[in-house]
């Protein structure tokens, strides 16, 4: 059974900073999925998000229909409290991936990656 809603969204985000704008690009634009199957979303930053402290300042959010965005992954690979272990984040520098090991119907929504290295 295919899930009837769009799983993914594309986000391009510009944030001003002293070293120039950081542009975040996600792919794919949308991804039809089947419950029980894996899914993967890619995110690329125009600048490295790896801080001198060794952390990647990249967060993943899920916005379910009719709800506010909820934090899934912070600092590139850390699951937020209450997030199922089927969600995992990986990557470093400019290239990151969110993986869902086994998609469930409740996972439908729009997924966003967000850099947290620069703030307005």
Swiss-Prot record:
GO CC terms: blood microparticle; extracellular exosome; extracellular region; immunoglobulin complex; plasma membrane
Record keywords, A-Z: Adaptive immunity, Cell membrane, Disulfide bond, Immunity, Immunoglobulin, Immunoglobulin domain, Membrane, Secreted, Signal
Positions of the UniProt region annotated as Framework-2: 60-74
Protein name: Immunoglobulin kappa variable 2D-28
Described purpose of this protein according to its UniProt entry: V region of the variable domain of immunoglobulin light chains that participates in the antigen recognition. Immunoglobulins, also known as antibodies, are membrane-bound or secreted glycoproteins produced by B lymphocytes. In the recognition phase of humoral immunity, the membrane-bound immunoglobulins serve as receptors which, upon binding of a specific antigen, trigger the clonal expansion and differentiation of B lymphocytes into immunoglobulins-secreting plasma cells.
Annotated spans, Complementarity-determining-2: 75-81
UniProt source species: Homo sapiens (Human)
Source species, domain of life: Eukaryota
Sequence segments annotated as region (Complementarity-determining-1): 44-59
Region spans: Complementarity-determining-3: 114-120
GO-annotated biological processes: adaptive immune response; immune response
Stretch list, region Framework-3: 82-113
Signal peptide positions on this chain: 1-19
Localization, UniProt: Secreted; Cell membrane
Keyword flag Membrane: yes
């Amino acid at each position: 059974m295919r899930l009837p809603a769009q799983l993914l969204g594309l986000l391009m985000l510009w944030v001003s900073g002293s070293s120039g704008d950081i542009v975040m690009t996600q792919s794919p634009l949308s991804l039809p999925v089947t419950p029980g199957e894996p899914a993967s979303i890619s995110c690329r930053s125009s600048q490295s998000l790896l801080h001198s402290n060794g952390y990647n300042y990249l967060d993943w959010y899920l916005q379910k229909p009719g709800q506010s965005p909820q934090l899934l992954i912070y600092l590139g690979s850390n699951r937020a409290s209450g997030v199922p272990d089927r969600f995992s984040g990986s990557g470093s520098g400019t290239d990151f991936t969110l993986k869902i090991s086994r998609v469930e119907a409740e996972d439908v929504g729009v997924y966003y990656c967000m850099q947290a290295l620069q703030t307005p």
